C-alpha cells in the first residue's frame, strides 16, 4: 500500500519556488568540487526516527499520525507496512541509503529465537525493496540499550550473561549486514559506561568492551563479511559517563586495544554539543587521525542540555562541518545519516518528507559554501600564513627538520628572546568574511 500518493517525487526547483515539496538548494546532478551533489552527499534515512518515533515524551503521549501503524494485524504485519512506508519516503526524496537498529525493523517476540526469525522475515522484505529500488544499506546496528537487561551496559555489564546476550544480537546483526550488503556496522554504547565510580572497575569494563569488539571482528572475518566498524561517541545520556565520551577518547581507546585498523568514527552533531565541542572540532579530530568514517546529521538546541536530535538547519555550523569533510576527501564508504526527528508538533506524515527536504537543502548549501572556501583558499591561506615562522626563519626550520635541541633553542632565546614580534589573528575579520561564503 502507498501512503504518500498525493506527494510527487521531490525535485530541485531553486530558491524562487513556493512549492513546499521541492528542493531549493539540493540538485543531485549539480557538480560541486568535481562531483555531483549526489556523489558528494551520501544521504541516508534513519529507520527509527523516520518510521517508529511516535512523538511521546516524558510529559505527554504520542502525537504522530502514522497510517502504517493504524491498520491492525500482528506486530509482524505492522513491521512489513513500516518497511513499505519507509522505502516510499526514501524514493520520494531520492535518498539512496538507509540505516536501522535491529529492534526498529522487527518485533523482538518472546525469545531470542523468535526475534531471529522475525529479523529473517523482515530483512527478506528489505532485500526485496533494495533490489527493486537500488537503495543500499549504509549501516545497521543492534539496539543494546532499551531492554532492561542492558541497564548496566552490555560488554561493560557486571553480568557475563548479559555480555553473551549482546554478543548474540551483534552476531545476528553482522549476518544481516552481509545479507543486505551493508558497508558499515555501528556500535553506539549508550549504556557502556558507569553510573558511579564507587562500585565500578573501570579498567575491567574497558577490557571487556575491547574483547567484545575483537570478538565481533573475528566473527565478521569468519563469515567473510568485514564491514567498516564505526564507534559513535557520546558523553552521556542515557549513562552518566559513557566510555566513548568524544572523538579523542574513542580514538585513545581504539589505539590502546589495537582496534584502530578496523574502526573509524561515526560522529553526530548533537553528541558533539553535549561534550562542549563543535561538530567541526569532532570532525577535525577524526580527520587528523584518519578515522572519519560517517556522520549522523542533526543538531541540538543551544538553550537545552540534552540530545534533541533536530533536523539540521544551521547553515554556518554545517558549512564548517562540510569543510572538514571535503578536506578529508569525503566520507568514503560512509554517509550522511539523518539521525533526526520531527518535533512532536510536526505530527503529519508529510512532515517527515518536509523535514528531510530541509536537512538535505542545508547540507547542499553547506557543500557549496565549503567548496568555495577551499577553491578560494580562504582559510588555507590564512592557516599557511599563520605558521610561516616555521618555514621562513632559521630557528623555525631547525624545529621542523629535527636539528633543533634544547641547547640550541635556549641559545636562540638568550640572544633574540626580547625581540619576538607576535602576529594578530584578526579573528573578527575572518569570521566576518566567512559569512560571505554562506549560501
UniProtKB/Swiss-Prot annotation:
Its cofactor is Mg(2+). Its EC number is 5.3.1.5. Gene3D superfamilies: Divalent-metal-dependent TIM barrel enzymes. Coiled coil: none annotated. InterPro entries: Xyl_isomerase-like_sf (IPR036237), Xyl_isomerase-like_TIM-brl (IPR013022), Xylose_isom_bac (IPR013452), Xylose_isomerase (IPR001998). The active site is at 101, 104. The keyword Metal-binding applies. GO terms for molecular function: magnesium ion binding; xylose isomerase activity. It catalyses: alpha-D-xylose = alpha-D-xylulofuranose. Pfam families: AP_endonuc_2 (PF01261). Belongs to the xylose isomerase family. Homotetramer. This is Xylose isomerase. It comes from Lactococcus lactis subsp. lactis (strain IL1403). The lineage of its organism: Bacteria, Bacillati, Bacillota, Bacilli, Lactobacillales.
Amino acid at each position: 500500500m502507498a501512503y504518500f500518493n498525493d506527494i510527487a517525487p521531490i525535485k530541485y526547483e531553486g530558491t524562487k519556488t513556493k512549492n513546499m515539496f521541492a528542493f531549493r538548494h539540493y540538485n543531485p546532478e549539480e557538480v560541486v568540487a568535481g562531483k555531483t551533489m549526489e556523489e558528494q552527499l551520501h544521504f541516508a534515512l534513519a529507520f527509527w526516527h523516520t518510521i517508529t518515533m511516535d512523538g511521546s515524551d516524558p510529559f505527554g503521549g504520542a502525537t504522530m499520525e502514522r497510517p502504517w501503524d493504524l491498520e491492525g494485524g500482528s506486530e509482524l504485519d505492522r513491521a512489513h507496512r513500516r518497511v513499505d512506508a519507509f522505502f516510499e519516503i526514501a524514493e520520494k526524496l531520492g535518498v539512496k541509503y538507509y540505516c536501522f537498529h535491529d529492534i526498529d525493523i522487527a518485533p523482538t517476540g518472546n525469545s531470542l529465537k523468535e526475534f531471529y526469525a522475525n529479523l529473517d522475515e523482515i530483512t527478506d522484505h528489505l532485500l526485496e525493496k533494495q533490489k527493486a529500488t537500488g537503495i543500499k544499506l549504509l549501516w545497521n546496528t543492534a539496539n543494546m540499550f532499551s531492554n532492561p537487561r542492558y541497564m548496566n551496559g552490555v560488554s561493560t555489564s557486571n553480568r557475563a550473561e548479559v555480555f553473551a546476550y549482546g554478543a548474540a544480537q551483534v552476531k545476528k546483526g553482522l549476518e544481516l549486514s552481509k545479507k543486505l550488503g551493508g558497508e558499515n556496522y555501528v556500535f553506539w554504547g549508550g549504556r557502556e559506561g558507569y553510573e558511579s565510580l564507587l562500585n565500578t572497575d573501570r579498567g575491567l569494563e574497558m577490557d571487556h568492551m575491547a574483547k567484545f569488539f575483537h570478538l565481533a571482528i573475528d566473527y565478521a572475518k569468519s563469515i567473510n563479511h568485514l564491514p567498516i566498524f564505526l564507534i559513535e561517541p557520546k558523553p552521556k545520556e542515557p549513562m552518566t559517563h559513557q566510555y566513548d565520551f568524544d572523538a579523542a577518547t574513542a580514538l585513545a581507546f581504539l589505539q590502546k586495544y589495537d582496534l584502530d585498523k578496523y574502526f573509524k568514527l561515526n560522529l553526530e552533531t548533537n553528541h558533539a554539543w553535549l561534550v562542549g565541542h563543535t561538530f567541526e572540532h569532532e570532525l577535525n579530530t577524526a580527520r587528523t587521525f584518519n578515522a572519519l568514517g560517517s556522520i549522523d546529521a542533526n543538531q541540538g538546541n543551544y538553550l537545552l542540555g540534552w540530545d534533541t536530535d533536530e533536523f539540521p538547519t544551521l547553515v554556518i555550523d554545517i558549512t564548517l562541518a562540510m569543510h572538514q569533510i571535503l578536506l578529508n576527501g569525503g566520507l568514503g564508504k560512509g554517509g550522511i545519516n539523518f539521525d533526526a526527528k520531527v518535533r512532536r508538533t510536526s505530527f503529519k506524515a508529510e512532515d517527515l518528507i518536509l523535514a528531510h527536504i530541509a536537512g538535505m537543502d542545508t547540507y547542499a548549501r553547506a557543500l557549496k559554501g565549503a567548496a568555495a572556501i577551499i577553491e578560494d583558499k580562504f582559510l588555507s591561506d590564512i592557516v599557511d600564513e599563520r605558521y610561516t615562522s616555521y618555514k621562513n626563519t632559521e630557528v623555525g626550520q631547525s624545529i621542523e627538520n629535527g636539528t633543533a635541541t634544547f641547547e640550541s633553542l635556549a641559545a636562540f632565546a638568550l640572544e633574540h628572546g626580547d625581540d619576538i614580534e607576535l602576529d594578530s589573528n584578526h579573528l573578527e575579520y575572518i569570521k566576518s568574511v566567512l559569512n560571505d561564503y554562506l549560501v
